[in-house]
């Protein structure tokens, strides 16, 4: 499962700078939607072959009131659920009382912690960092997050235990990525069959108290009592195998404590990190929205993370019963206005409590998964690419027309289309969005985003010594030189 890195430290030590540097390396086109708000505290990062969730826990001042009382509840949860903690300090400001208080808390939690001395640019770093050894948390790592110095080395070192699971070699390179190779027809068919035979992993996500617990129990059956308030279950989600009409599912539970007989009395435990990890590990995301509260910023944040991860998506607007027609019309209008950028996703209006509309969710879940794992031939993808060029030619780049040559499938779930050509990486984002939308319309993809990768064609003469002429070229060159000399004499 994808590791979680928590950035911890007092205010103004550079946590946000490092967070922004790590998260903006993930530039998949699928996340480039207008109107989509991004959560400033949780992000998906990709650096040096490692993929991980990074969490900015916010500033902790460590006052005399006690470190526990000064830390936000979500910050404490982030530290508890993180696999790696980067304890950031300010090398210029030196060791402070707040640093000591934070270190004491981290020592008590026995988390895998790395002390990072930030802002070492332009100073004697070794001297400035010496006092941080007294924190008793091991080696002190130097970094200048604003300039990017030491960032990659820090991530490689701190996430080294996860390298084997991610297929990363000792030289820091990962295995050949899906988009760097072209599937043969046999490989594509075998991969599609493998995916279709697997159970659909479904993550039901949403902000607290939107009805995730009620819906999960409705899906599992009312007679089933589900209690997950046990040691060891607070960190990872629960995986529940189930079957419906011959189709196997694995339900990823993120709701926390739930007892069927006391579902109305139990306050749902909500963990952002648990939810994000479930999104990374699932095939289809079922996002629950509360009809009575409308679309909240937290809903958009979860939606953004699901799109970043390239997951197939179904939206369920819960608590639809019991509200009058005027409110229903207003909610539908808001959905059209704020969720227009995900018009590929099915939206259902349900009542998890009474079961209204729940059965139809399965149809959309299976439809979304089938779209995400559908096999499309290279010839079909290339033909669609050519049709897109005919409708809207690529722009000029440095006075030359960008040429698109061919396209092929680069992966499934999410579907990845790799377009090869000349100067394609210089294409403006507007044209890339045009291509993505064109493929989605042409393939009639429902319930899943499409990712488009662009690869420049290689130079077949690269690495060759073109200055050395062959024997026949030398002869022709001598004849030409002689001809020119004779002409000049005349």
Curated annotation (Swiss-Prot):
InterPro entries: G_ENGA (IPR031166), GTP-bd (IPR006073), GTPase_Der (IPR016484), KH_dom-like (IPR032859), KH_dom-like_a/b (IPR015946), P-loop_NTPase (IPR027417), Small_GTP-bd (IPR005225). GTP 2 binds at residues 206-213, 253-257, 318-321. Residues 3-166, 200-373 form the EngA-type G domain. The keyword Phosphoprotein does not apply. GTPase that plays an essential role in the late steps of ribosome biogenesis. It comes from the Bacteria. Residues 374-458 form the KH-like domain. This is GTPase Der. Belongs to the TRAFAC class TrmE-Era-EngA-EngB-Septin-like GTPase superfamily. EngA (Der) GTPase family. Keywords: GTP-binding, Nucleotide-binding, Repeat, Ribosome biogenesis. One of its GO terms (biological process) is ribosome biogenesis.
């Amino acid at each position: 499962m994808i590791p979680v890195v928590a950035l911890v430290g007092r205010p103004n030590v550079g946590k946000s700078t490092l967070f922004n540097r790590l998260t903006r390396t993930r530039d998949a086109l699928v996340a480039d939607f207008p109107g989509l708000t991004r959560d400033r505290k949780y992000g998906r990062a990709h650096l040096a072959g490692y993929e991980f969730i990074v969490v900015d826990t916010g500033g902790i001042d460590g006052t005399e009131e006690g470190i526990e009382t000064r830390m936000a509840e979500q910050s404490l949860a982030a530290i508890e659920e993180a696999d790696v903690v980067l304890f950031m300090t300010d090398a210029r400001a030196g060791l402070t009382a707040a640093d000591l208080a934070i270190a004491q808390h981290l020592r008590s939690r026995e988390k895998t912690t790395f002390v990072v001395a930030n802002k070492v640019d332009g100073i004697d770093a070794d001297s400035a960092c010496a006092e941080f050894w007294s924190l008793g948390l091991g080696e002190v790592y130097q970094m200048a997050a604003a300039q990017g110095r030491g960032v990659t080395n820090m991530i490689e070192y701190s996430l080294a235990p996860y390298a084997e699971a991610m297929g990363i070699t000792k030289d820091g390179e990962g295995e050949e990525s899906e988009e760097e190779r072209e599937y043969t027809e046999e490989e594509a068919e075998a991969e599609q069959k493998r995916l279709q035979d697997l159970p659909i992993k479904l993550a039901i996500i949403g902000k607290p108290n939107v009805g995730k617990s009620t819906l999960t129990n409705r899906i599992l059956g009312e007679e089933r009592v589900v209690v997950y308030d046990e040691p060891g279950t607070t960190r990872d989600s629960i995986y529940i195998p189930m079957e419906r009409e011959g189709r196997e599912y694995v339900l990823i539970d993120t709701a926390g404590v739930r007892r069927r007989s006391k579902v109305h009395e139990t306050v749902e435990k909500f963990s952002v990190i648990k939810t994000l990890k479930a999104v990374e590990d699932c095939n289809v995301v079922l996002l629950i929205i509360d009809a009575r509260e409308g679309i909240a910023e937290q809903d958009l944040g979860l939606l953004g993370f699901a799109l970043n991860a390239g997951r197939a998506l179904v939206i369920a607007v819960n608590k639809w019963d019991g509200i009058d027609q005027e409110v229903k019309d207003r909610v539908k209008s808001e959905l059209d206005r704020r969720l227009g950028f995900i018009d590929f996703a099915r939206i259902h209006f349900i009542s998890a409590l009474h079961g209204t509309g729940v059965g139809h969710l399965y149809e959309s879940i299976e439809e979304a998964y089938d779209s995400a794992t559908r096999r499309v031939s290279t010839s079909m993808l290339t033909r669609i690419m050519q049709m897109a060029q005919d409708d809207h030619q690529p722009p000029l780049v440095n006075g030359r027309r960008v040429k698109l040559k061919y396209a092929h499938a680069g992966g499934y779930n999410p579907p990845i289309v790799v377009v090869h050509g000349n100067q394609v990486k210089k294409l403006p984002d507007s044209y890339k969005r045009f291509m993505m939308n064109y493929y989605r319309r042409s393939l009639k993809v429902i319930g899943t985003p499409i990712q488009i990768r662009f690869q420049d064609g290689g130079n077949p003469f690269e690495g060759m010594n073109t200055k050395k002429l062959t024997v026949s070229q030398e002869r022709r060159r001598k004849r030409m030189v002689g001809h020119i000399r004779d002409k000049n004499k005349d």
